[in-house]
Amino acid sequence: MLRSTTFRSGNPAPRSTPDEAPHHRKTLKPYGNMKNYSAKEIKNIVLIGAPGTGKTTLAEAMAFEGKVIDRRGSIEANNTLSDNTDIEHEYKRSIYSTILFTEFMDRKLNIIDCPGSDDFCGSLFSAFKVGDVGVFLFNAQNGWEVGSEIQARYARLLKKPVIGVVNQLDAEKANFEATIESIRAASRVKPVIVQYPVNQGPEFNAFIDVLLMKMYRFKDNDGHREELEIPADEMDKAQELNKELVEMAAEHDEALMELYFDKGTLTQDDIRAGLKIGLAKRELMPIFCTSGKRDIGTKRLMEFIIN
């Protein structure tokens, strides 16, 4: 079952009443005020992952980045956009697949927040039928889980590409490296690191993007970021991962492979083209870093999806 969260001018989406929630938010972009988009300007994104990987929280951050809402809700406060029924409030988890939307970089993103439990896998199947790409979340403390395999199976069955997101990197026992190794061991799709965290754990506020070769640092838990040069003590690791990224992007297209052999590297646009081909063939899973709860990395993930 797919359920749409609708917005009406002047009213927030269905949720707890102001008395039940710690804050009352304003819906900034009701559907009636949207521009008309062509099919090429619309992306349907399916958020998948085992229970507790942070799909609903990431969906909330994406809506915030697109200025659909002026303040993020939380699972604990029972006021997220997608978990808005009494039973979801009671159990503190998604029961239904819910469709949200946001506008970002002159594109419309339809975001389908799917339940992680295999008890509700029918709604995941429905979501993938209409989705363009899966955003596959992993809890940085747990890595690949039993629930991850179930979600991956549906992506394979319906031949959908997936982008990997290591979420909750601000958790006490977050372990990015172990998470990546667990994905490599279990996934039939090769993970390729696009970002890695600088300081995972409770102090997590920065990651290095080896596609753009920049470091991004965040503050205030509101998505605001600084773009910085990569520190000297991280440069060797960043360059090594950039080389792996280039090689994996090149190997999926003969023209890119020839260009790589000729020049020894690829431009950022060439890398994106190679990753797009690898995604379409369902042979690559680009890996991104986020903390949905702190809105770290959300905007960069959305930029990649659009570009």
Where are these regions (language model features)?
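Intrinsic-disorder-associated, low-complexity terminal segments enriched in Asp/Asn/His/Tyr and depleted
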Residues: N11, H23-H24, N33
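Short polybasic linear motifs
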Residues: T6, A13, T17, A21-P22
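P-loop NTPase switch module centered on the Walker A-proximal segment
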Residues: G32-F138, N142-W144, I193
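P-loop NTPase catalytic nucleotide-binding module
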Residues: Y31-T53, R71-R72, N139-N307
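Acidic, low-complexity intrinsically disordered tails
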Residues: F7, K26-Y31
